[in-house]
């Protein structure tokens, strides 16, 4: 005979695990991936940080 109590308990555990996994996936998707080339430019063998794209004069080479 089926043990409905055990089946329900296993189902609840599975739902909790899926919920945790979905929350983790959601938090990972909400984080911003850092792109150093969005904030830096290359000049004379070094990377330099810029506050905005307007600060870049265009004379230097982006890499």
Curated annotation (Swiss-Prot):
Protein name: Non-structural protein 3b
Source superkingdom: Viruses
């Amino acid at each position: 005979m089926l043990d409905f109590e055990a089946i329900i308990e296993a189902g609840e555990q599975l739902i909790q695990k899926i919920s945790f996994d979905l929350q983790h996936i959601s938090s990972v998707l909400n984080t911003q991936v850092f792109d150093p080339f969005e904030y830096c430019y290359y000049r004379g063998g070094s990377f330099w940080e810029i506050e905005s794209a307007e600060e870049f004069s265009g004379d230097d080479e982006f890499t």
